[in-house]
Amino acid sequence: METARGRVLSVASECVPLLKTGGLADVVGALPGALAAEGWEMRVLMPCYRPLKWRLEEMEEVFAEEDLFGGPGRVMAGEVAGRKMLLLDAPHLYDREGGPYAGPDGDWGDNAQRFAALSWIGARIAREGLGDGWRPDVVHAHDWQAGFTPAYMNYWGSGGASSVLTVHNIAFQGWAPASLLSALRLPPQEFHPAALEYYGGLSSLKAGLVSADHITTVSPTYACELMRPEFGMGLQGVIAQRAGQVTGILNGVDTDIWSPEVEERPYDAESLKAKAENRAVLSGAFKLSVPGPLAILVSRLTYQKGIDLIPEVLPDFIAAGGGLAVLGTGDAPLEAAMRELEVRFPGRVGVRIGYDEGLSHLMFAGGDAVLVPSRFEPCGLTQMYGLRYGAIPVVALTGGLADTIINANPAAMAAGCATGLTFHPTEPPAFAEALRRLIHLYADPAAWETVQRNAMRHPVGWETSAAAYAALYRELVA
């Protein structure tokens, strides 16, 4: 590892292996190690939720804050699984039953204060550093939960640190009523459309977008999409005004964890024999007998993910010999629709409602194809897992899906570079046609194996992404 050439404070609401509700945690957890290889030292600041309280016994207090939006707080430092972590211990904000963002009755009513506190501490560390003399050159805030961080740095001082805001999913914007402006320690004179005001209220994400020195999103295509009304979700104008400071950088995946070579029945691009063994085990787990391609769906079951399209396109796919194994949870009507397909097509469709990390690994190892029909997808990790395991991705042409999959059209097949199948628009006819192409490809074993091997050789690790972030940091601190 190179000697650290810079210091970065990552401010986020979740991070593996401490806590995960979605892909954000994977990214935040992967960046420190990936950036270390580029010579950057990253520390991660996140809230100390109730399930993490026990870790405080192994950590040291860095500093305290007497009045942290309604009560005292303290920052605790320690190392977790090789990551230098800073946990914000503020019991009045984080020590409660339920998830990090919501309780049994919905979103926590004080989420604005809870995550303003996280941002406030991030900005304080930028200004004052830590007790050991560590002070960041760059503060990297993630999504709405850390969106106020660049704003606080602007209004209360940054200590010379630069700020980056990464938009992982613009659908979540951190809205709060304007009446909280002063309580959130934001200057009233900045409550106007060019700054903090957002449709009569506040948005922590908008505050970050107008305040950060640079904005990143999690794929180049998503960076462009966010400037269009159908994807920007009300913030397209804000982002378009800052187009010169917006960069799309694809996420990567942890290739040590997500690797067919470390599974129970290992295989690689040079020897695919054990993939058939995994397929047999997967078929047994879901009680399936599928003569054609066995597709998998590992996803949140939501409209955004295009799950409502599955019942419309699946009958023809089944009739042509295909099958489907589903793992996911989400909207009740879509969960019910998946169960109905299982009843309608016994032995050809299997469904597990919920999430099981071990089962998901088996599904990628045994699946012939993975379906990702998202209406929008900022980056997407599922298709990258598919590439890694030779489960050929069938994806909608949007966001990170468009940036990671090379469509198996005649030109790409002739050039020997195809890695999957894409379709556009995200509607049943186009999706159904992509599945027909999948059936046709599967019927040609040589062509199928070529695409499989191409997919498995496609780089999906963090090396390229980390280099891009490191280049951005260097530019900001130059």
Curated annotation (Swiss-Prot):
Pfam families: Glyco_trans_1_4, Glyco_transf_5. SUPFAM superfamilies: UDP-Glycosyltransferase/glycogen phosphorylase (SSF53756). ADP-alpha-D-glucose binds at K20. CDD domains: GT5_Glycogen_synthase_DULL1-like (cd03791). Its EC number is 2.4.1.21. One of its GO terms (molecular function) is alpha-1,4-glucan glucosyltransferase (ADP-glucose donor) activity. One of its GO terms (cellular component) is cytosol. Pathway: Glycan biosynthesis; glycogen biosynthesis. Keywords: Glycogen biosynthesis, Glycosyltransferase, Transferase. InterPro entries: GS/SS (IPR011835), Starch_synth_cat_dom (IPR013534). Synthesizes alpha-1,4-glucan chains using ADP-glucose. This is Glycogen synthase. The gene is glgA.
